[in-house]
């Protein structure tokens, strides 16, 4: 199965072409322009490098959140357009799951002893995150928007942490520095390893897509924000 994978949930958008779980090519944009300006040219470059046309694809996989509200909307709209035009199905992928899957073997600690925290910076000491066993990706804290200090408190109460089954915590993603500071503020004695730049999102999206996720019609792609936007919060507060 050949898939175009896309991520616009982070500050840097990315895209790649994968076949049967193997990378053909991918690209991460470091341009300072907005996703609305960079994403589709990025897709065109990746597909040209892979020598792939839309009719050659079996489906499209895209991160649907949480993350950048505007970025998520841009990615979903673009993928919907491509899928509807080519008559292909789509796979919706969680941004935090893709982050977790993209960082396999990021440390020397055995995966069965590691708790992974994929975290996306949501500003104002907040992160979009979840906590999961690194080897199985079994969630121990659900994907949600968390205050970083509150999240540290919740992590320290996870039974697998209390009883030492998971002796290292791996924090990945743009929220890693926020979480590092929160652990320091809490004077936590847990073994923390932060890897903000370890994620290769196209790889994570592809691994999530090839993990047996359901293919859906493009029209059914929906964002998973996990929080209201700042504009909505301001409107609600008058």
Residue ranges and their predicted role:
Residues 1-64:
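N-terminal beta-alpha supersecondary unit
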Residues 22, 89-199, 230-231:
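Surface "functional belts" at beta-alpha junctions
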Residues 30-38, 69, 73, 77, ...:
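Residues at secondary-structure transition points
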Residues 46-50, 85, 103, 201-210, ...:
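Stable alpha-helical structural segments in soluble proteins, enriched in small hydrophobic residues
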Residues 50-55, 83-93, 109-112, 216:
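Phosphate-handling active-site elements
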Residues 61-90, 95:
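DPxDG-like acidic metal-binding loop motif
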Residues 193-238:
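Acyltransferase
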